[in-house]
């Protein structure tokens, strides 16, 4: 699994737990709708830590909490 796929998988899992939609990141985190769409539709190339931090801070979790998931053990790239 590619890192970007694992990031999206993890974001979707957290979103399901918190019952939120991708639009939440635009409204509450100021992330551009186009950036959100590209990420969730697999059109985002590489995900930078700065970009990911925008999502985690909007969710109220640390990067450490975000990456503390077995899905990242499956990353091969």
What are these regions (language model features)?
Residues 19-38:
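Short alpha-helical DNA-recognition segment
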Residues 1-21:
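A short, Lys/Arg-rich alpha-helix, primarily the initiator
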Residues 27, 41, 68:
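Phosphate-coordinating loops and pocket residues in cytosolic domains that bind phosphorylated ligands
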């Amino acid at each position: 699994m590619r890192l970007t796929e694992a990031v999206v998988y993890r974001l979707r899992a957290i979103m399901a737990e918190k019952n939120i939609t991708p639009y939440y990141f635009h409204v509450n985190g100021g992330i551009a709708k186009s950036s959100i769409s590209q990420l969730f539709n697999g059109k985002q190339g590489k995900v930078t830590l700065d970009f990911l931090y925008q999502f985690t801070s909007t969710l109220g979790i640390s990067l450490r909490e975000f990456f503390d998931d077995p899905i990242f053990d499956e990353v091969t790239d």
